[in-house]
């Protein structure tokens, strides 16, 4: 692309997106990966995004191509260009919003990619898939909660956060499995996620209720401090004020959590 995507007018952008989609569809029908790879590896982030969104739409609108699409993504995942691998993972994330089983293996591989961009694409995909297709995604994520690699544990913890913002009850049992985490960076992410799933309407009650069942009082204390702080930082968006959150915790948690 000669001009950057957002240098174009709105109509020109729509035309580019349509062209990308049509070209990818034609390439999939003929199993020509070169054209797809060109879009997947484009320097412009928005071109790559248009490409993976197109793959997701094609997968569901052209069911006869689903096998070919997965095989094409399998082949492209072997490419040396990290941008192409990253876009493969994002494409799988679009598909996994509905059909996770068919693309699960992309995330198994992507978690261990040598480039952080591909690993970050796994986190982003877990977030967007988990928001709308939580059952199989959280079941998959649970398998990695105790992985020997601390970065894998951290990425999984981070990835399930978005689902928890609306439905904290869905991810709290998974977070509980990390309550005795010894690695500071993973523990910090755990506390951060607990804070992030606490500030919307009705969520604090769910979170505090579940934290009552945790045995590690130190991590619970850290989580409560983060929850109160989040209610201050997000004061324009949170259901309760900082003071109300602190009062609710004090009234509903059976112990003085500040006594560490």
Where are these regions (language model features)?
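Eukaryotic acidic, Ser/Thr-rich intrinsically disordered low-complexity regions
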Residues: 215-260
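Structural detector for internal amphipathic alpha-helices that build alpha-solenoid repeat scaffolds
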Residues: 4-27, 49-63, 85-98, 117-132, ...
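Short inter-helical turns and helix N-cap capping residues of alpha-solenoid HEAT/ARM repeat scaffolds
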Residues: 9, 43-46, 80-82, 114-115, ...
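Generic beta-strand or strand-like secondary-structure segments
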Residues: 54, 68, 72-75, 79, ...
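Short, contiguous, helix-prone interaction/anchoring segments in small proteins
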Residues: 35-55
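Hydrophobic, aromatic-enriched interface-forming segments
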Residues: 138-161
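Amphipathic alpha-helical scaffolding segments comprising HEAT/armadillo-like alpha-solenoid repeats
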Residues: 2, 26-39, 60-76, 97-110, ...
């Amino acid at each position: 692309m000669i001009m950057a995507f957002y240098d174009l007018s709105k109509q020109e952008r729509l035309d580019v997106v349509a062209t990308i989609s049509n070209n990818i569809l034609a390439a999939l029908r003929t199993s020509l990966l070169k054209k797809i790879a060109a879009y997947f590896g484009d320097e412009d982030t928005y071109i790559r995004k248009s490409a993976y969104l197109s793959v997701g739409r094609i997968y569901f609108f052209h069911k006869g191509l689903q096998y070919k699409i997965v095989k094409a993504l399998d082949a492209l995942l072997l490419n040396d260009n990290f941008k192409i691998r990253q876009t493969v993972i994002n494409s799988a994330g679009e598909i996994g919003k509905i059909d996770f089983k068919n693309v699960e293996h992309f995330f198994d591989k992507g978690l261990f990619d040598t480039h952080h961009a591909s690993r970050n694409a796994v986190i982003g995909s877990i977030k967007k898939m988990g928001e709308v297709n939580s059952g199989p995604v959280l079941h998959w994520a649970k398998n990695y909660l105790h992985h020997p690699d601390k970065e894998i544990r951290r990425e999984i913890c981070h990835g399930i956060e978005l689902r928890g913002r609306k439905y904290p009850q869905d991810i709290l049992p998974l977070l509980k499995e990390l309550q005795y985490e010894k690695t500071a960076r993973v523990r910090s992410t755990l506390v951060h996620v607990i804070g992030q799933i606490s500030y919307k309407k009705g969520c604090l009650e769910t979170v505090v209720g579940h934290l009552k069942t945790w045995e590690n009082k130190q991590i619970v204390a850290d989580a409560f401090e983060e929850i109160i702080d989040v209610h201050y930082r997000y004061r324009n968006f949170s259901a309760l004020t900082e003071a109300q959150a602190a009062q609710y915790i004090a009234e509903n948690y059976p112990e003085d959590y500040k006594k560490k």
